[in-house]
Structures are given as structure tokens and as C-alpha cells.
A protein has these predicted regions:
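Short, solvent-exposed loop/turn segments at secondary-structure boundaries
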Residues: 51-52, 87, 116-119
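Feature activates predominantly on carbohydrate-active enzymes
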Residues: 1-85, 99-103
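C-terminal functional modules
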Residues: 253-413
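Catalytic-core regions of glycoside hydrolase
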Residues: 9-11, 93, 99, 103, ...
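Conserved beta-strand positions in the central sheet of alpha/beta enzyme cores
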Residues: 38, 106-108, 231
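Glycine-rich, histidine-containing beta strand-loop boundary motifs that form or position
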Residues: 40-41, 77-81, 108-111, 140, ...
Length: 413
């Protein structure tokens, strides 16, 4: 491949983006200096589950529109072939896509129980390159970690340079990717620079309770010098994915990713909900006990019409109301009010149980679950720390404060 790729791979589980959302993403990517978009949504039936079925005329027309929408963005169309797929099967399936203008095919062999298929995946890739005259982005079955495996050895032994192999980092989702890790992965792939499938800000599967609205962090700037590129896997909400994508594009350009994110969330009014969906340790975490003014800003968030975002907005507003009630109670105690005078203003505290049961996690509520799995020397997944992180929410902190204040009040009565 003549140049590195940077952009987005729509590769999540869950409701795929619409055509309009994909076009809007391509517009944003082009404006921010990226150069790639990959269509590979797991829930699109003819991408994965019904992979042998021909793409419909509408799908092919949509692909052509994406491919030719902006010549600054290279569009690749992906396929997850089944375990019995032959080269001819894939040629028949993908030739209409190539005829529509696609010059890079993405073959996705991730999350398949075929760790003995390295040689076969190499041969399928070569067949596609040779017979369709395209380059191939390949998602291997062993896609995480830095160890070698029989699968990777078989895949990379004699693999054509027209095939670029993806890698997610040391685990499926990872907080950091270093140059040393990328170099080790390149070594076990026969000195082939990996193309990073970066699983941020994705919120599918076990992460579906979370919104990831923070900046692009934890990626060594020098990674740009040792990889074939970086593709971000976004969230089900295209719009909510944009703050991190814009931040990542700044990182790719060698600029300050944090500053770019900050400008984005202020410009597009994301900051408060971004802070409300953060966790301790993240740069946009508002603190364990934010101010009354901050909670008032959360409550004042306007209702959201986007169904992929609105549940988190409502969850944050509900939690903030509880915290404001806690402020009222504690200020009442401090001013000398009797417990009987505080009953009415304390009633919102009783909503804590219902709020904790809300599926959408906000204000630090847990548990926080992420697929922090690596792959070992056999290619099998291995659990690591961080898969489940137990947290105490901001709301619980304030309710604890109220209880302590009431205990102290009773002790002095």
C-alpha cells in the first residue's frame, strides 16, 4: 500500500449506521485530514451472517455513492466469509463491489472459531488480490496481543505485501498502545507493520451501557512511524463518535488531541454529557463531588431526540436531581434546620434505587465492563484485569454524605 490509512472502520456489533450517517462521517473525516472509511458492520446480514447472498442493487448503489463521495477518502467494503468459503465464492460476492469502484477489500476473520485456518486465510487473500486486482485489509482470527501463534505463523508465511494485517493492540479494548507493543506485533507477523483496528470509542456488546465521549488518549505519537495506519471502531451513534474521532484526527496530524477534543465538545455542546458519562481516571471526569452549579448544568441539558444518546442524557439528569437534593439537605442541616423540616426536600433521594437500575451508566455508576481480553500463544482469548471494574457513583457519594450528616444531626439532638 502506497500510504498509511487513517480513519474509521464501522465494525461494531449492533444497529448499523444509515447511509446518511456514513456520508456525514466521510465528510467529517475528509475535513479533519483522515483518508479511510471501512464498511464492515457486524449486523449487516450480507456482510456476515448471510455472507454468501449477493449484495442487493440498493446496497451496491450505496457503496458506489460512498466510494465516489469524496476522493480524499478511500472506501473499503468488508466481508466476513464463512469457514467453508472458497476463493470463487468470495470473487462472485465481491466482484460487483469492485465494479462499483472499490479498490481495497476488507476480509474479516475475527471472532471465528478457526485458529487452524491461517494458511487458508492467506490463500483466500492472495486469490482476491490476484483475481480482482485489489489490495486486501485482513482482520486475522488472532487479532489481539503481542505473542505469536501457529495461526499467525501460517498466515504471515509468504503473505503478499498487498495484504495488510490488522491488530487491536495488546487486548481487544486497550487503554494504551505503545511503540514497543506495535514493534513486537510486527516482529511476530514477519516484520509486517500492523494496521491498528482501534476499538475506541466503540460501545457495543458488554460496553453497551456506556457512552465514550472522551478524547483520544493513550496512543504513543510515535506509533504513526511504525504502523500501516489506524482505524477507529466507532459507537452505534455516529454523532456521539465524532468528538473522539476529531481528537484522533488531530493526533494523526501531529497536533494536540486533547485541545482538539476540548474545542469540539465546547463548540458542539458535548462537554457536560461527556463529563457525566466519564469514569474516574479519565481526563474529562468531573470529580467525585462536583459543584452544585455543575449538577444544575446537567439537569438543564435539553431533551435529546437521538435515540442512541437520549437515554444517557435522561439518566444523567435523573442522577443530578438526586445530587441536588443531597446538596439541599446538607445545606439545610448546616443552616440549623430540623430533620422534620428536611423531609420534603429529601424525597428525591429515594429515587437512588431506580436510578442505579437504569441500564445507561452515568455519573460514574458501575460496574464498568469492557472486553479487556488478550490472545495467548495459541490464539485463544485470555482474560486480563480491567474486564469488570466496580465503581461507586457520584450519586452514591452524595447519598453517603447525606447519611453521615443526618447521623451527626441525630447525635446532637
Amino acid at each position: 500500500m502506497e500510504h498509511q490509512l487513517f480513519g474509521v472502520i464501522e465494525g461494531f456489533y449492533g444497529d448499523p449506521w444509515s447511509q446518511l450517517e456514513r456520508l456525514a462521517c466521510i465528510d467529517a473525516l475528509a475535513g479533519w485530514g483522515a483518508n479511510a472509511y471501512v464498511w464492515a458492520p457486524k449486523a449487516e446480514p450480507r456482510h456476515r451472517d448471510a455472507w454468501q447472498d449477493p449484495f442487493t442493487a440498493e446496497e451496491l448503489s450505496n457503496f458506489a455513492t460512498l466510494i465516489h463521495h469524496d476522493d480524499r477518502i478511500t472506501v473499503s467494503i468488508g466481508l466476513t466469509p464463512g469457514s467453508t468459503a472458497t476463493i470463487d465464492d468470495i470473487i462472485i460476492k465481491m466482484k460487483p463491489v469492485v465494479d462499483a469502484g472499490c479498490r481495497i477489500i476488507t476480509l474479516c476473520f475475527d471472532d471465528l472459531p478457526v485458529l487452524d485456518a491461517g494458511r487458508r486465510h492467506r490463500e483466500l487473500s492472495h486469490g482476491i488480490c490476484d483475481q480482482l486486482g485489489v489490495e486486501v485489509l485482513l482482520v486475522p482470527t488472532h487479532y489481539a496481543g503481542t505473542t505469536s501463534s501457529p495461526y499467525l505463523e501460517a498466515l504471515c508465511d509468504g503473505l503478499d505485501d498487498r495484504v495488510i494485517v490488522m491488530w487491536t493492540g495488546n487486548s481487544v479494548v486497550t487503554d494504551e498502545i505503545s511503540v514497543a507493543q506495535a514493534n513486537t506485533r510486527a516482529h511476530v507477523m514477519g516484520s509486517r507493520a500492523p494496521l491498528i483496528w482501534d476499538n475506541v470509542p466503540v460501545n457495543d456488546a458488554m460496553m453497551s451501557s456506556h457512552l465514550h465521549l472522551g478524547p483520544y488518549v493513550g496512543r504513543d505519537p510515535k506509533l504513526r512511524d511504525v504502523v500501516s495506519g489506524v482505524l477507529l471502531n466507532p459507537m452505534i451513534s455516529m454523532r456521539a463518535s465524532l468528538p473522539m474521532i476529531e481528537s484522533a484526527c488531530a493526533w494523526w496530524r501531529g497536533e494536540n488531541a486533547i485541545d482538539a477534543w476540548s474545542q469540539c465538545v465546547d463548540r458542539d455542546d458535548w462537554r457536560i454529557i461527556a463529563e457525566a458519562t466519564a469514569y474516574p481516571g479519565e481526563l474529562h471526569w468531573p470529580g467525585d463531588r462536583p459543584s452544585r452549579q455543575w449538577f444544575e448544568q446537567v439537569v438543564a441539558l435539553p431533551p435529546c431526540t437521538d435515540p442512541d444518546i437520549s437515554p444517557w442524557v435522561e439518566s444523567a439528569r435523573s442522577g443530578a436531581r438526586i445530587c441536588l437534593a443531597a446538596y439541599d439537605v446538607m445545606e439545610g442541616i448546616a443552616s440549623g434546620s430540623l430533620a422534620s423540616d428536611l423531609t420534603r426536600i429529601a424525597l428525591p433521594l429515594l429515587n437512588l434505587r431506580q436510578w442505579l437500575q437504569t441500564p445507561e451508566r452515568t455519573l460514574g455508576s458501575g460496574p464498568r465492563t469492557r472486553p479487556v481480553f488478550t490472545q495467548d500463544e495459541t490464539g485463544r482469548f485470555a482474560i486480563t484485569s480491567g474486564v469488570i471494574v466496580l465503581t461507586t457513583s457520584i450519586v452514591e457519594n452524595f447519598v453517603h454524605d447525606v447519611n453521615r450528616a443526618l447521623d451527626a444531626l441525630e447525635a446532637t439532638s
